[in-house]
Design a protein with these regions (language model features):
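Conserved glycine(s) in the ABC-transporter nucleotide-binding domain "signature"
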Residues: 1-118
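Anion-binding and metal-coordination hotspots
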Residues: 2-6, 10-11, 15-17, 21, ...
């Protein structure tokens, strides 16, 4: 479309001016014109004060065409007219923490062409506003963040590698500035691990095959996360996927104490995956700390006597205590393992804790295990809602297995975790042909159904109320929520990173 000044003489009054536009008519598939604005007779326009109406409106038409051309250029620009503003809450937190100067000092070992704190902020804003790769951040996110500086793609790559090369420094900066505003509570700390998988076939020095939370068979990496008493992250660590997560509990707590100047006694809280004799030794003997762990109640973790005690009804020493909501519905019930003091001035007294013997290798290359005794309270709980959920899951697995076993030879790799409910037995037929026979492991199924809803907590805090121990332990759902938020909303799986520093920075 373009504008032009049309001059005509429709009457004896003289020259008549109109602004016309031409356009393409899709119906006739031809160019056409139409009146955009009627201006009037030249004589009337002169009488209104315009000395030369033809020249005057010719200039206006020229300006209209220039504006039209400028608008067209804006429409085909590769820059979006929309701007992200959802980062203002995060920006306010950055401003409150006031850590730009510290970040720039930490990054001063390298010469940057910009304030490194601006890059640090912008990368965080980008990952919160629209999670994705570094290329996506460069092309589609950072240019559209309101009031944020732009960076070249090479600058982003360099900064990401620099951050990942020593990411603990930035965690230390965060903790330092948080401590300036809020007093961090570290009398209890929560610890858990997760892992991330990568769409690659071959292992790298950092990405190794190991047990995956998503049952992925390829290389993975692990992340250990430590939270304070308010369930605010304190520290994190990344490690190859083939390594055990258990040593990282000790390492993170040691680093957290030294970096944050924590000298008092703390209570380590973790699930049964972190419960091992070496971690208990590190907490109680080496660090003079305490612990609250869950403990497996099936298999070889407990003696037959203790397993029978878990299922036992009330007797003279062991009584279940109900915990109910305000309308009287049972939330859970609990009991503690009772012991009789055999000697001393309190001989014959019944207490809800006992001395338990543990043994472990202090160093991996030690020839002998070290034995040590811990004064420990053991609390068993029963949750009816959890019991119903677990029984439904077991029955669903069993029904699925029955269908599989009825029409094919089951292979452990096909069944996955459900293999625990299947007996695999090699049978020799006439000494020539070996066939693998499969059958349901009814004993295992019955045992799991029997213990559904039960859980055991073990703690060094023998004077603590069992309900308080239960409450503290179940705050672990916060760390699980942290991982869930990271993996879902923030897409924290570093699918677009390959080397260790980039993965850590992501």
């Amino acid at each position: 479309m373009i504008y032009f000044l049309k001059k005509s003489t429709p009457s004896k009054k003289g020259l008549y001016l109109q602004i016309y536009s031409n356009y393409y008519d899709p119906n006739t598939k031809k160019k056409n014109t139409k009146s955009y604005k009627a201006l009037g007779y030249v004589s009337d326009l002169k009488a209104s004060g315009i000395d030369d109406p033809v020249s005057y409106y010719s200039d206006i038409v020229k300006q209209m065409n220039e504006q039209l051309l400028e608008n067209k250029e804006l429409q085909i620009s590769d820059k979006s007219t929309q701007k992200y503003a959802g980062h203002f809450l995060v920006k306010a937190m950055f401003d409150l923490l006031d850590m730009d100067r510290t970040i720039n000092i930490v990054a001063s070992t390298h010469k940057w062409q910009y304030k490194f704190s601006d890059m640090y902020r912008t990368l965080c804003y980008s990952q919160i506003l629209s999670p994705g790769s570094k290329l996506k951040a460069f092309e589609r996110v950072i240019p559209n963040i309101y009031d944020a500086p732009n960076f070249s793609y090479d600058q982003i790559l360099d900064a990401v590698n620099f951050i990942g090369g020593d990411y603990h420094k930035y965690i230390e900066v965060l903790n330092h500035h948080i401590n300036d505003i809020w007093e961090r509570k570290t009398d209890k700390v929560y610890f858990d691990c997760t892992n991330y998988y990568f769409e690659i076939d071959l292992e790298t020095p950092f990405l190794k095959k190991g047990p995956s939370k998503e049952n992925f068979k390829g290389p993975i990496m692990g992340q250990a996360l430590l939270l304070d008493s308010d369930q605010i992250p304190l520290d994190t660590e990344f490690y190859p996927g083939n390594e055990s997560e258990k040593p990282y509990l000790r390492k993170r707590i040691e680093d957290m104490k030294s970096r944050n100047g924590v000298h008092g006694r703390i209570i380590q809280v973790a699930d049964k995956g972190l419960n091992c004799a070496r971690n208990i030794y590190a907490a109680v003997v080496e660090a003079n700390d305490g612990y609250i762990f869950s403990k497996s109640i099936k298999g070889r973790s407990l003696s037959k006597e203790e397993q029978d005690w878990i299922l036992m009804d009330d007797d003279e020493f062991n009584k279940w205590e109900d915990v109910r909501d305000e309308v009287g519905n049972l939330i859970y019930k609990y009991k503690t393992s009772k012991h009789i003091i055999r000697s001393g001035k309190n001989a014959g007294k019944v207490v809800d804790y006992g001395n338990y013997l543990y043994k472990c290798k202090i160093n991996p290359d030690d020839e002998k295990e070290t034995e040590f005794t811990v004064k420990e309270k053991r609390i068993v709980t029963y949750n009816p809602k959890l019991a119903a959920k677990q029984r439904a899951e077991i029955n669903r697995e069993v029904e699925k297995l029955k269908k599989i076993l009825s029409y094919k030879i089951a292979v452990k790799e096909d069944i996955g975790d459900s293999a625990k409910y299947v007996n695999f037995e090699a049978k020799d037929k006439d000494g020539r042909k070996i066939k693998v026979a499969t059958s349901l492991n009814q004993e295992k199924i019955d045992a799991d159904l029997k213990f559904a809803g039960f859980n055991m907590l073990v703690t060094s805090e023998v004077k603590a109320d069992p309900k308080e121990i239960y409450k503290v332990y179940h705050n672990l759902w916060r760390i699980e929520e942290s991982f869930r938020l990271l993996k879902t909303y923030l897409q924290s799986r570093p699918a677009f990173a390959s080397d260790e520093d980039t993965i850590n920075a992501f």
